[in-house]
């Protein structure tokens, strides 16, 4: 008997419960490989108990929620597929440079879904950390179908109210760090009404990101205007289970979303079990038909003064003809040719979300970002470990005590800081990077390094105010931001980081005695308590990625401003 056959026989001799324990040391791909080894092994391996363990080992949901999610899906195997391929890669904090007060999108598990919620720049009451009251707004969600498939919805609004914009998930890479909103070309099968994704891009076809910025913006406008579905506010707010929501309501909402994704505006009169052979696909737009009787420039030639062609926007299509004439095509020719190539690559066009990996560079924990691209960037969140105790997301306000407001005021500006460890001149430092602030006008741009602390250098400075009842575990020497505006050339002054507990810090500027107090945050727990308020979403493009430089809070003051011109 050969070794492989002998090993298979040993596995078959194991009781199911014993194999389930062993399966904790196997990956989902290992389980799938065993299933392919034969019918006998499949009967042992491909069981609900085994896949339940695999769902646990993904480590994105507690066991209780895994069991609750199973009610709305065909099997734990299908659920594991959704957790591995969609939920785990997307969870975390995603950011953008603009507006400069902060653009933080927190992606977390919903109910048989993964949801993106924007944390709004805001002022908070003294008891905010105890009451967990924060303002947030829906950005997008990906729902899980009965078979483990997925469907994408972008949140937004038009003049009549809140909308959902159904679309496609165009791929999620395991280690993705860039999230892109795009218009995707689709090919119709000649034999039926089904839609299939192209197997590969033909040589010379232009991807969406290579179009001029204004063309991308107009295409997104066209598609969202045609696929948007109006919803009532409660449907727009119940993205995740809270203490106030019950399982019945969440199941009802999910059923509605699945219908909307499948049938579009006709969802109220349809059942999910129906084939739904519609004469059109509710998620797709026949842009080329719209352009048949109109010059395509009717849609695209607006705001020509804003067109910029970057080196990445050069076109393969023009390369041969231009080289033969030994002339360089103009920016207008490149732009027009790229647009024509893109529009010819599909019969219809839909909204797409793609999560991909790029080798990004960082400056003090903040990613270098591309302008004029509808992108969100993942901010690495390090878990607190023994040698990096203070890593992670922190929220706080200026002043002491932490819960006291200045005289005559009832609220203080909320700051979110990401704390990371780096090596600087052979020394280990703790960097506090600002990712959100709640002032009316920005004082420091998004991504500013608020302080740098030498974590191995104790501070001898005393705490500047009377705190007899407070015991400080440690204090470290460092420097905090002062004058200057920007990222790389800010002024700084000496300061100290005081550790009250591992979840409560205070940084003090030595000269001014100015102080910011910080508490460690768990946004999932805060949002699931349901005590915060949901701010209506903005125009769909603006709601995903705000592209204009601004020092104001665009997600509250301009939430009803539906004009999105750059």
From Swiss-Prot:
So which domain of life are we looking at? Answer: Eukaryota
Region of interest (Disordered), ranges: 318-338
> Which residue windows are transmembrane per the record?
none
Question: Can you tell me which residues the record assigns to a coiled coil?
Answer: none
The Low complexity compositionally biased stretches are 320-332
| F-box domain ranges (all copies) | 8-54
Alphabetized SUPFAM superfamilies for the sequence: F-box domain (SSF81383)
The protein's matches in InterPro entries, at most eight in alphabetical order, are given as: At5g39450-like (IPR040275), F-box-like_dom_sf (IPR036047), F-box_dom (IPR001810)
Q: Which PANTHER family match?
A: F-BOX PROTEIN FAMILY-LIKE, OS08G0105100 PROTEIN
Q: Write the protein's name.
A: Probable F-box protein At5g39490
Q: Which organism is it from?
A: Arabidopsis thaliana (Mouse-ear cress)
């Amino acid at each position: 008997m050969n070794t492989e056959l002998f090993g298979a026989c040993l596995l078959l001799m194991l009781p199911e419960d014993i194999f389930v324990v062993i399966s904790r040391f196997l990956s989902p791909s290992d389980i799938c490989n065993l299933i392919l080894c034969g019918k006998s092994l499949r009967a042992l391996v491909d069981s609900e108990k085994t896949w339940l363990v695999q769902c646990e080992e993904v480590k994105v949901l507690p066991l209780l929620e895994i069991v609750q999610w199973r009610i709305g899906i065909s099997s734990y195997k299908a659920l594991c597929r959704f957790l591995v391929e969609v939920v785990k890669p997307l969870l975390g904090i995603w950011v953008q440079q603009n507006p400069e007060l902060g653009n933080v999108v927190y992606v977390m598990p919903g109910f048989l879904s993964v949801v993106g919620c924007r944390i709004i720049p805001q002022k908070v009451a003294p008891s905010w950390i105890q009451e967990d009251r924060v303002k947030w707004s829906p950005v997008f969600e990906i729902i899980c179908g009965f078979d483990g498939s997925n469907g994408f919805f972008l949140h937004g609004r038009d003049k009549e109210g809140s909308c959902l914009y159904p679309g496609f998930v165009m791929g999620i890479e395991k280690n993705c760090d860039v999230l892109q909103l795009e218009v995707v070309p689709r090919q119709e099968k000649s034999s039926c009404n089904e839609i299939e994704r192209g197997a590969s891009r033909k040589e010379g076809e232009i991807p969406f990101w290579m179009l001029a910025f204004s063309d991308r913006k107009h295409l997104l406008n066209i598609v969202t205007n045609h696929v948007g579905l109006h919803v009532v506010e409660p449907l727009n707010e119940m993205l995740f289970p809270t203490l106030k929501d019950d399982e019945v309501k969440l199941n009802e909402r999910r059923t509605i979303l699945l219908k909307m994704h499948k049938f579009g505006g006709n969802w109220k009169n349809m059942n999910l079990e129906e084939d739904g052979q519609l004469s059109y696909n509710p998620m797709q737009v026949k842009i080329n038909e719209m352009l048949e009787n109109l010059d395509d420039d009717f849609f695209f030639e607006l705001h020509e003064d804003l067109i910029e062609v970057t080196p990445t926007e050069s076109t393969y299509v023009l390369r041969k003809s231009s080289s033969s004439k030994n002339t360089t095509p103009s920016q207008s020719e490149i732009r027009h040719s790229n647009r024509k190539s893109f529009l010819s690559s599909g019969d219809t066009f839909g909204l797409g979300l793609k999560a991909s990996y790029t080798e990004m560079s960082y400056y003090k924990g903040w990613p270098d970002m591309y302008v004029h691209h509808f992108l969100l960037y993942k901010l690495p969140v390090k878990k607190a470990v023994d040698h990096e105790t203070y890593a992670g997301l922190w929220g706080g306000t200026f002043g002491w005590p932490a819960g006291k407001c200045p005289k005559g005021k009832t609220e203080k500006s909320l700051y979110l800081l990401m704390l990371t460890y780096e090596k600087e001149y052979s020394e280990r430092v703790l960097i506090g990077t600002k990712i959100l602030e709640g002032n009316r006008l920005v004082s420091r741009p998004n991504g500013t390094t608020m302080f740098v602390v030498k974590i191995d250098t104790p501070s001898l400075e005393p705490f500047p105010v009377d705190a007899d009842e407070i015991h400080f575990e440690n204090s470290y020497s460092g420097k905090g931001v002062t004058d200057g505006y920007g990222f790389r050339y800010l002024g700084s002054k000496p300061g100290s980081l005081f550790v009250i507990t591992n979840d409560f810090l205070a940084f003090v500027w030595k000269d001014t005695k100015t102080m910011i107090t910080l508490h460690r945050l768990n946004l999932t727990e805060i949002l699931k308590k349901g005590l915060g308020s949901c701010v209506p979403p903005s125009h769909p493009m603006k709601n995903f990625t705000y592209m204009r430089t601004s020092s104001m809070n665009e997600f509250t003051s301009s939430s009803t401003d539906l004009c999105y011109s750059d």
